[in-house]
Amino acid sequence: MSRMSARFVGRAVGMSTGWVYGMWKDMGLIIKDKFGDWALTEAGRNIGGQMSKSNHCPVPTFKFETIEQLMIDFYNEHRK
């Protein structure tokens, strides 16, 4: 699969976009910048995260295979 934003990851795993962003924030992969937009942290970049190339409002994206497994592991460790 390709790179996906929170909206498409949410669709793939059956969760809302807000839920995905919340989990990514809890995982330390993204933060809100001074303008209130999502931005990657160093940890997010270290696992291959990139900002989308949108001129309107770039968003964090990850390779689905990578982020899916990390989300499953995080959920099993922290959210049960």
Model-predicted regions and their roles:
Residues S2-G14, Y21-K80:
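Positively charged, aromatic-accented nucleic-acid-binding surfaces
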